[in-house]
């Protein structure tokens, strides 16, 4: 069969989840449409790629909160292109039409989803946000209220899927007859990794603004080795070693670490649970990440925090002292659902 796979390019989570499915669909003819971080991660792996724009948040002076104005200013021309079927929409739609796929698979990517609807091609949505938009699970009332607006935006700009597959590391029940909800989708490299409990603490933030001088200072005060993934590599100093976020290095480091300090992306949290790694989780200012961080703490597999608390004296040490407590609760959640998703497709 022939598939177009549209992948949202902001951060690595959409790309790593999609990579898991692409690996399950080997032997099929697939055109991958992606931009940003997703394109950078997948293009070296040899997939047939077509670069498209990426909607992304822009951060201002506040390190823990994206700027509404700067983000809108950045995304407005792209949103206008989507809704008016502008130049980028036209070239993406034409490439899909020329490829003649049997279906379009979509991970939170608006141009490919709306093009599929316009061309009358079956649309299969495979992402995390479907769990929030087409699922029901226990959550605080404040987050549930915030979710209503976010869900309406998500459904509006992504198109109308014929089939919905949602993935999350926490349990949820579908509220739509088109929807199937599963647990974490794990890429092949993580599934096959040797899981060890090493001595180093892994630090990875999707938003590099989170790695502030104050947090770096606190990490240097720890009596453990820290392996930090950053975009611009400084020289190693004190107990911190810096790495660039390539696929092989990241899998090696996460599978052998003792625990993780990270932002609250659903995909990384799912991989951490599969590898039985406790998490100290710092959400970005989005409803989805706040829900993920709440779920981590509610499940008892880690702690949620913010940048100020993370930079405070003794907080990371407290987390490290409770590692075994968190790790003991992880085993029931360690399963890979990528074969289930491939069967659904």
Which residues make up each language-model segment?
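A short, glycine/small-residue-rich beta-strand->loop->alpha-helix junction that serves as a flexible
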Residues: 5-19
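Conserved nucleotide-sugar phosphate-binding/catalytic loop shared by glycosyltransferases and other
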Residues: 8-9, 28-82
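Conserved nucleotide-sugar donor-binding subdomain of glycosyltransferases
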Residues: 68-103
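Leloir-type glycosyltransferase catalytic cores
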Residues: 74-78, 156-166, 170-173, 301-345
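Conserved nucleotide-sugar donor-interacting segment of glycosyltransferase catalytic cores
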Residues: 91-148
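A donor-sugar binding/catalytic signature common to diverse glycosyltransferases
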Residues: 104-107, 252-292
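A nucleotide-sugar donor-handling region in carbohydrate enzymes
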Residues: 134-135, 140-210, 231-232
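Donor-nucleotide binding loops and adjacent catalytic segments primarily
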Residues: 183-259
């Amino acid at each position: 069969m022939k598939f177009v796979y549209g992948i949202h390019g902001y951060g690595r989570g959409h790309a790593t989840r999609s990579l898991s499915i692409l690996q399950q669909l080997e032997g099929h003819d697939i055109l991958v449409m992606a931009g940003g971080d997703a394109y950078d991660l997948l293009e070296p792996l040899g997939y047939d790629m077509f670069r498209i724009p990426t909607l992304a948040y822009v951060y201002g002076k506040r390190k823990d909160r994206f700027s509404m104005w700067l983000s809108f200013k950045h995304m407005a021309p792209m949103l206008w292109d989507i809704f008016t079927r502008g130049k980028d929409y036209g070239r993406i739609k034409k490439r899909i039409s020329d490829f003649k796929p049997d279906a379009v698979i979509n991970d939170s990517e608006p141009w490919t989803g709306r093009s599929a609807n316009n061309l009358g091609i079956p649309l299969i949505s495979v992402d995390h946000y479907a769990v929030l938009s087409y699922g029901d699970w226990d959550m605080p009332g404040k987050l549930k209220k915030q979710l209503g607006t976010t869900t309406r935006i998500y459904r509006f700009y992504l198109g109308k899927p014929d089939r919905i597959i949602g993935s999350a590391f926490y349990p949820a029940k579908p509220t739509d007859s088109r929807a199937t909800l599963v647990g974490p989708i794990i890429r092949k490299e993580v599934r096959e990794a040797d899981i060890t409990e090493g001595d180093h603490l892994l630090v990875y933030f999707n938003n590099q603004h989170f790695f502030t001088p104050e947090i770096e200072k606190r990490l240097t005060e720890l009596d453990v080795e820290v392996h930090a993934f950053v975009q611009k590599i400084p020289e190693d100093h004190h107990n911190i070693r810096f790495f660039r976020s390539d696929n092989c290095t990241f899998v090696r480091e996460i599978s052998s670490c003792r625990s993780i300090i990270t932002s609250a992306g659903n995909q990384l949290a799912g991989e951490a649970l599969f590898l039985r790694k406790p998490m100290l989780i710092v959400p970005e200012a989005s409803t989805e990440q706040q829900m993920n961080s709440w779920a981590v703490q509610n499940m008892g597999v880690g702690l949620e925090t913010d940048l100020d608390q993370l930079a405070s004296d003794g907080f990371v040490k407290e987390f490290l002292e409770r590692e075994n407590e968190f790790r003991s609760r992880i085993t029931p959640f360690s399963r890979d659902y990528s074969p289930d998703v491939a069967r659904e497709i």
